[in-house]
Amino acid sequence: QTLQTSSQSQFHGLKFSHASSFKSPSAPLRKNSIFAKVTKGSTPPPFTLKDQEGRPVSLSKFKGKPVVVYFYPADETPGCTKQACAFRDSYEKFKKAGAEVVGISGDSSESHKAFAKKYKLPFTLLSDEGNKVRKEWGVPSDLFGTLPGRETYVLDKNGVVQLVYNNQFQPEKHIDETLKLLQSLK
C-alpha cells in the first residue's frame, strides 16, 4: 500500500511538492552531476530560452560584452531569493563593468515574471523547463542529485568562460566573486 501526500517543503532554496521529487541517495551518480562540462577557458553550448515576458533570448545576444549567467534552483525560495536580490542590489556595479546578468532556473516564464516583479529584479530571467541547458552546461546537482545546483559563470565579451563559481549554501558569495572577476577584465 502506497501513501502519497501533497505536502510542500523547502530545503536550501528548492521547493519540493511531492516525495517523488527526491531521487534515492543510493542511485548511481552520473558523471555530469559531479563535473561541469563548461569550464574556465571553454565556450559554453549556445541556447535559446524564454525570458520572463515569454520572449526567446539567445546566449549569442550577449556577445560583445561580458555576461554573468547564474543557474539557481527555484524562484521564491529563501536562498534563491537572497541571491537574486543580491544581484539586484549590485546591478549598477555590473552595468558599470559593462556586464549583463542572466538568471536561469527550471521555473516557467510566468513564475519568473511574478518573481521579477515582486523583488524588482532589473535583469533577465530565463526559463529552462526540463533543465536541458542546465544539463548541457553540466551544472552539478547537490545532495545526491536531489537539488539543482547553484552555479555562476562569467563569460567575457568573446563568449569564453572566465569564471565558474559554485556555492550552494552561500548564494551572496556569487556576487562578490563575479564582481571581482569583472573588475580584472577591465
From Swiss-Prot:
Per the UniProt entry, the Enzyme Commission number(s) are: 1.11.1.24
Can you list the disulfide-bonded cysteine pairs? 80-85
- Residue span(s) of domain Thioredoxin: 38-186
Q: Where is the active site?
A: 80
Q: Name one GO cellular component term.
A: chloroplast thylakoid lumen
What's in the keyword line of the UniProt record? Antioxidant, Chloroplast, Disulfide bond, Oxidoreductase, Peroxidase, Plastid, Redox-active center, Thylakoid, Transit peptide
What Gene3D superfamilies does the annotation carry? Glutaredoxin
First and last residues of the transit peptide: 1-36
Which GO biological process entries does UniProt record here? cell redox homeostasis; cellular response to oxidative stress
Enzyme's top EC category: oxidoreductase
What's the catalysed reaction?
a hydroperoxide + [thioredoxin]-dithiol = an alcohol + [thioredoxin]-disulfide + H2O
Instruction: Please list where the region (Disordered) is annotated.
Output: 33-55
Q: Name one GO molecular function term.
A: thioredoxin peroxidase activity
Localization per record: Plastid, Chloroplast thylakoid lumen
Superkingdom classification of source: Eukaryota
Function per UniProt: Thiol-specific peroxidase that catalyzes the reduction of hydrogen peroxide and organic hydroperoxides to water and alcohols, respectively. Plays a role in cell protection against oxidative stress by detoxifying peroxides.
Q: What else is on record for this protein?
A: The active site is a conserved redox-active cysteine residue, the peroxidatic cysteine (C(P)), which makes the nucleophilic attack on the peroxide substrate. The peroxide oxidizes the C(P)-SH to cysteine sulfenic acid (C(P)-SOH), which then reacts with another cysteine residue, the resolving cysteine (C(R)), to form a disulfide bridge. The disulfide is subsequently reduced by an appropriate electron donor to complete the catalytic cycle. In this atypical 2-Cys peroxiredoxin, C(R) is present in the same subunit to form an intramolecular disulfide.
Family per record = Belongs to the peroxiredoxin family. BCP/PrxQ subfamily.
Assembly information from the UniProt record: Monomer.
- What is the protein name stated in its UniProt record? Peroxiredoxin Q, chloroplastic
Biological source species: Sedum lineare (Needle stonecrop)
